[in-house]
Curated annotation (Swiss-Prot):
It comes from Human herpesvirus 8 type P (isolate GK18) (HHV-8). Residues 504-513, 539-556 have a biased composition (Low complexity). It is found in: Host nucleus. It comes from the Viruses. One of its GO terms (molecular function) is transferase activity. Glycans are attached at T366, T367. This is Replication and transcription activator. Transmembrane segments: none annotated. Residues 655-677 have a biased composition (Polar residues). It is an enzyme of class 2 (transferase). Its EC number is 2.3.2.27.
């Protein structure tokens, strides 16, 4: 098996996914798919390829007809699987062979037709069974619902994803076939349930699939709305709203258009026809019909029972009788209000073709034929001329006969028609299908007054102007008390800048309306000027240990003298300034300062530890807008708070004037080296304000 598959684009095991088919037919399907793959490299006659595909489809339908009441569903799914293989061969080929391989080029649209058919028929089975009083086995309903879910997801997605999840669908179909045979052998399926499956799951009309292939053979393209059972080319996604919409997964509220729009597919029951209790009252008529028969059910009048037309399967081609009967039952009916019933024309009957039926010829049938004539045998249908007055363009209804139902001939009520019976309602029917079905039309009378101004004007958003301040002007501004009238930096919303003691920074903050580019250039120049005016450090040797070069950090006395000397403005009314360290470099942060100094500098016994505490205290005061610098060191941790977290009082909402550190949650092991005091306090404050 593996040697036979070598060098081929399809494995032999792939065709084993077909359900209910013989090994001989699976081998023929494998050769057919290989032929389609080779058609992209070797030129074949498109008509010959179409004949091969048609022969394969007919054999699939005939073998599926032996699978019981669900033969129509198994036929659609097997054809869906076949055209998925055709589309896969098209996607593997980079070059477009166009009209030389019609079955592969049209496979995308045919897959959509089959997918929408399976979705519609599966939902139709649940609705019709509930409305007709027919019970289906729960296990079969569960498998049908899983297939319904897969097909619904395909109809809601893009066209290119129609082939996805092919293998799970075929596995579900195989399980459904085995379960159905088990129930049927055990006699657990009633006659009504089997008749219901035959009426709902009707096999696909074969010319519906072969028509686009014949069109492509002639070098043309089928219209886009042909590849849908609703006749719609656009894929819409109507959203349903309700209380149960959001109970399932996202997107489950979307409804495919095949479940909303009117159905224009031959062989499918109308969407509004859900109560078939009168038809299922005599299921023997449905069960005794030939295999793969099409059932056309109509209801000429609300007070009359349903009428059923049985059209046997015709594999030779298009069946005019089926098309005419289906169109007669699918179109809208206009009731004739005349008192005297109109008789159909019998002497001036004419022959009609499929083209004439499509152009709007009105058919008047007197009986339902037992066997439809094959194509080319000269079968004729009595019709009326299109030039006949509208009063004579009526069609007789197929009404069940009340007498004459014998057990030997159970379908006698289908073969009787009495158009002249007074109890028969004559209806006029239009057989031309509408090109565009209008679901809703909204009209309004023109108003004499001019329409109001409906221009949507969005409100203008006012964003505050944020003026970043340099770090050189940030730390000295902390020493200015609140009583002087100056604002503290940070935490204020508005378009105005934050005043500070530095004249350059104050000028930068005042120009709040300056353009951004000009503002940035002024900030850079301000930073350069402040970098040049750094106070000169003392040249006398200090007693600091090696590695304690901390930039511009000096003693508190030097800081106080520098601040007093450089102060501007009315200094007489200002209180004495606090002793603060000089500002840090512009491009230097606290963590960079720690990395540069090294761990040996931040020791508890270091001479610069008071200066470090003052620096950290000023930073914390500026970050959290405190009135006074918070104390960092205390003789005992027990004096700052309660022993247990339960005793910690909740914040009252007011401003804190003095911060209290939080005790560490875990003690440091005795065998490990104690962390530095300042860094330990910094981590404590960070954890405190983070919580």
């Amino acid at each position: 098996m593996a040697q036979d598959d070598k060098g081929k684009k399809l494995r032999r095991s792939c065709v084993e996914s077909f359900v209910g088919l013989s090994d001989e037919l699976k081998a023929q399907l494998y050769q057919c798919v290989l032929l389609i793959n080779d058609a992209y490299e070797t030129i074949y006659d498109p008509s010959d390829l179409n004949r091969v595909v048609e022969d394969v489809c007919i054999r699939i339908m005939k073998e599926c007809s032996k699978l019981g009441a669900l033969c129509g569903l198994f036929t659609d799914i097997n054809m869906f699987n076949l055209f998925c293989f055709f589309r896969a061969s098209r996607m593997r080929t980079k070059g477009a062979a166009g009209y030389n391989v019609p079955c592969a080029e049209a496979s995308q649209g045919i897959i959509r037709i089959l997918t929408e058919r399976i979705l519609f028929c599966t939902e139709k089975a649940f609705l019709t069974a509930a409305c007709s009083g027919v019970s289906l086995p729960p296990a079969i309903c569960k498998l049908l619902h899983e297939i319904y879910t897969e097909m619904k997801a395909k109809c809601l997605g893009a066209w290119r994803r129609l082939v996805c999840n092919r293998r799970p669908i075929m596995i579900l179909t195989s399980s459904l076939l085995k379960l159905y045979n088990t129930y049927d052998t055990a006699g657990l399926l009633s006659e009504q349930s089997r008749a219901l499956c035959l009426l709902v799951f009707q096999p696909v009309y074969l010319p519906r699939i072969m028509a686009p292939l014949e069109i492509m053979t002639k070098g043309q393209l089928a219209p886009e709305n042909f590849y849908s059972i609703t006749g719609s080319a656009e894929k819409r996604r109507p959203i349903t709203t309700g209380k149960v919409t959001g109970l399932s997964y996202p997107g489950s509220g979307l409804m495919p258009e095949s479940l909303i729009l009117p159905i224009l597919e031959p062989g499918l029951l109308p969407a509004s026809m859900v109560d078939l209790s009168d038809v299922l009252a005599k299921p023997a008529v449905i069960l005794s019909a030939p295999a793969l028969s099409q059932f056309v059910i109509s209801k000429p009048h609300p007070n009359m029972p349903h009428t059923v037309s049985i059209i046997p399967f015709n594999p030779s081609g298009t069946d005019p009788a089926f098309i005419s009967t289906w169109q007669a039952a699918s179109q809208n009916m206009v009731y004739n209000t005349s008192t005297a019933p109109l008789k159909p024309a019998t002497g001036s009957s004419q022959t009609v073709s499929v083209k004439a039926v499509a152009q709007g010829a009105v058919i008047t049938a007197t009986t339902v034929p037992q066997a439809m004539p094959a194509r080319g045998t000269g079968g004729e249908l009595p019709v009326m001329s299109a030039s006949t007055p509208a009063r004579d363009q009526v069609a007789a209804c197929f009404v069940a006969e009340n007498t004459g139902d014998s057990p030997d001939n159970p379908s006698s009520f289908l073969t009787s028609c009495h158009p002249c019976d007074p109890n028969t309602v004559i209806v006029a029917q239009q057989f031309q299908p509408p090109q565009c079905v209008t679901l809703l039309q909204v009209t309004c009378a023109p108003s004499s007054t001019p329409p109001p101004d409906s221009t949507v004007r969005a409100p203008v958003v006012q964003l505050p102007t944020v003026v970043p301040l340099p770090a050189s002007a940030f730390l000295p501004a902390l020493a200015q008390p609140e009583a002087s009238g100056e604002e503290l930096p940070g935490g204020h919303d508005g378009d105005q800048g934050v005043p500070c003691r530095d004249s350059t920074a104050a000028a930068t903050a005042a120009e709040a309306t300056t353009p951004k580019r000009k503002q940035r250039s002024k900030e850079r120049s301000s930073k350069k000027r402040k970098a040049l005016t750094v106070p000169e450090a003392d040249t006398t040797p200090s007693t600091t240990t090696p590695g304690t070069s901390l930039g511009s950090i000096t003693t508190p006395q030097d800081v106080h003298a520098t601040d007093v000397a450089t102060s501007e403005g009315p200094s007489e009314a200002q209180p004495p300034l606090l002793s603060l360290p000089p500002p840090l470099d512009v491009d230097q942060s606290l963590f960079a300062l720690l990395d540069e100094a090294g761990p040996e500098t931040w020791d508890v016994g270091s001479p610069l530890s008071p200066t470090d505490d003052a620096l950290l205290s000023s930073i914390l005061q500026g970050l959290y807008q405190l009135d006074t610098p918070p104390p960092l060191r205390s003789p005992s941790p027990a004096s700052f708070g309660p022993e247990s977290p339960a005793d910690i009082p909740s914040p009252s909402g007011g401003e804190y004037t003095q911060l209290q550190p939080v005790r560490a949650t875990s003690a440091t092991p005795a065998n490990e080296v104690q962390e530095s005091g300042t860094l330990y306090q910094l981590h404590q404050w960070r954890n405190y304000f983070r919580d």
